[in-house]
A protein has these predicted regions:
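Short aromatic/hydrophobic "clamp" motif used to bind/position activated sugar donors
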Residues: 82
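Conserved donor NDP-sugar-binding/catalytic core segment of glycosyltransferases
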Residues: 90, 94-124
Length: 222
C-alpha cells in the first residue's frame, strides 16, 4: 500500500462550533494525496461525531494537552510529510499543492516553513516565510521527526518541540501565505497568553532556561 504524501494532524477539544471550517479547508484542497488524522481530546460535545464525517482516522483521548494529542497522531501517521492544523484555523485554497510543489523542488530539506495570514482584534496581518516557533506553518519530513515527540507541557509545547528539531534541520522557505491563524479567538490559549493571563511561573523551567539560546540560534539563522 502506497504511503500518502501528507499526514494532516488536527488535535481538537470541544470544537463543534468552528472545527468544520478547519476540516473543510482540508477537504476542499485540490491536492488529495493525504490522510487526515483527527484527535478528539477530552471532548464532551459533538466534536467526535463531526470528526467521523471527515475521516476514518479519529482518535479519542483524554490528555488535555495539544502536544500529547499530536504525539498520538504521529504514532499512527504514515505520510511522508506531516502537516499540523489547529482546530480553529484553516488552510488557504491550493495550499497542499503549493507545498507539495515546493517540496519537489527542495528534496533535501527537512522542514518547509511557509507564510500565514492571521487575525488580531479584527485586523488581518501577514507573516511570510519565517521560521516562527509554531508547528502549523510548516511541513515536517516524517523520517526527520523519527521518534521525537512533543513534551508533556500544558503550554508552549510548540517551543519544546521546535527547540529539539529546528537547530538540526535543513530548512526551506515558501514566501507565500498558505495558512490562516485565528490568533485571538476568545477563550483560546493564545488569546490568554496575548492578554497576559499567564505568568512565567506557569511555564516549565526548561522553557525559561533555554529561550535565550533558542532566540540566539534564530538570529544566526537569519
Amino acid at each position: 500500500m502506497n504511503k500518502p504524501f501528507f499526514s494532516v494532524i488536527v488535535p481538537l477539544h470541544n470544537a463543534e462550533n468552528y472545527m468544520r471550517m478547519a476540516l473543510d479547508s482540508v477537504r476542499e484542497q485540490d491536492f488529495t494525496d493525504y490522510e487526515l488524522i483527527i484527535v478528539c481530546d477530552a471532548c464532551t460535545d459533538s466534536s467526535e461525531k463531526i470528526a467521523h464525517e471527515y475521516s476514518d482516522l479519529v482518535l479519542n483521548v483524554n490528555f488535555g494537552r495539544a502536544g500529547l494529542s499530536r504525539n498520538a497522531a504521529l504514532d499512527i501517521a504514515t505520510g511522508k510529510w506531516i502537516l499540523f492544523l489547529d482546530d480553529d484555523d484553516y488552510y488557504l485554497p491550493g495550499a497542499f499543492r503549493k507545498i507539495a510543489d515546493a517540496l519537489s523542488r527542495m528534496p533535501d530539506i527537512d522542514i518547509l516553513a511557509y507564510g500565514f495570514d492571521w487575525k488580531n482584534v479584527g485586523a488581518v496581518k501577514q507573516n511570510h516565510g519565517q521560521v516562527f516557533i509554531a508547528v502549523w506553518n510548516k511541513a515536517w519530513k516524517r523520517s526527520f521527526i523519527g521518534n521525537e515527540r512533543f513534551p508533556d507541557w500544558i503550554h508552549s509545547d510548540d517551543l519544546g518541540f521546535a527547540k529539539k528539531m529546528h537547530p538540526r534541520a535543513k530548512f526551506g522557505f515558501l514566501d507565500e501565505p498558505l495558512y490562516y491563524y485565528n490568533f485571538m479567538r476568545p477563550g483560546s490559549v493564545s488569546d490568554k497568553i496575548k492578554a497576559g493571563e499567564y505568568d512565567n511561573s506557569q511555564f516549565p523551567d526548561e522553557i525559561l532556561a533555554d529561550v535565550k539560546g533558542y532566540e540566539d540560534w534564530l538570529k544566526r539563522l537569519f
